[in-house]
Amino acid sequence: MEFFKYIFYGIIQGLTEFIPISSTAHLKIISLLFGMDDPGSSVSAIIQIGSVFAIFWYFRKSISNYKNTNSRKPSYSFLFNKLNKSIFIGTIPIVFIGVIIKLFVPGFSDSFLRSNLSIALVSILMSLIMLFADISTKKSINLNNHKYPNNLYIGIAQAFAIVPGVSRSGATISMALLSGWNRKDAAKFSFLLGIPSISLAAFVEFFSAVNQFSTFPFLPLFAGLITAFFSSLLAINFLIKYVSSHGLKIFVYYRLIFGILILFNL
């Protein structure tokens, strides 16, 4: 039973990490619906490593050999090309906020912000923000012509995803659209921006839970990580294709209904 529970966690994590509906909220709420314990931030973060591997695999060519088409000199440097500089800039806000929370708000993971009421209210608020972003985009900015300040704004939006229910992909795609990005590249950059942020979260939680290692079911946890990898690949492929042609409205409606249902069942 324990084995299948973590496979279930992996499926939910992988699908909802990239579909803009909040993986943390769905892991918590769906687990409760099926009579299972909230996996908690440590387990969630470790399973998220599978999602990081999925991003690396899906975008492996973009990460290692990205070229700025506006330049006559193609960039072959992994560390210093424009895309990776953009990811670095976009990661700064969540690192800054994460360090502050870790040092000065030790009870954050058990605070009101992880409660069902907070998740419901945040989900409803995010549905409205996503709707406004979807109808406001100018579609003029892409991965080749974006400016570094855009990356910082998107990174600030990502930092808000520390709050359960926000959705990292929902916040970053919305901010990218509000900044004038086209939908397809907004989704791509959102996923690439997740590599350092998700990795850092997993790293911090992994070492924070070092004293609990003896109680961790490693084989089921590994199964959840592998499941998250494959379900993440499906979610990434689906969302890029879907958002490019249909936008975010279906997720807006889903998040609105999701939040209202939680409110009525508190």
Curated annotation (Swiss-Prot):
Q: Which domain of life is it from?
A: Bacteria
Please list the GO biological process terms of this entry: cell wall organization; peptidoglycan biosynthetic process; regulation of cell shape; response to antibiotic
Catalytic activity field: di-trans,octa-cis-undecaprenyl diphosphate + H2O = di-trans,octa-cis-undecaprenyl phosphate + phosphate + H(+)
Q: Name one GO molecular function term.
A: undecaprenyl-diphosphatase activity
Q: Name one GO cellular component term.
A: plasma membrane
User: What is the E.C. number?
Assistant: 3.6.1.27
User: Which family is this sequence assigned to?
Assistant: Belongs to the UppP family.
- Identification of the protein by name: Undecaprenyl-diphosphatase
Organism of provenance: Prochlorococcus marinus subsp. pastoris (strain CCMP1986 / NIES-2087 / MED4)
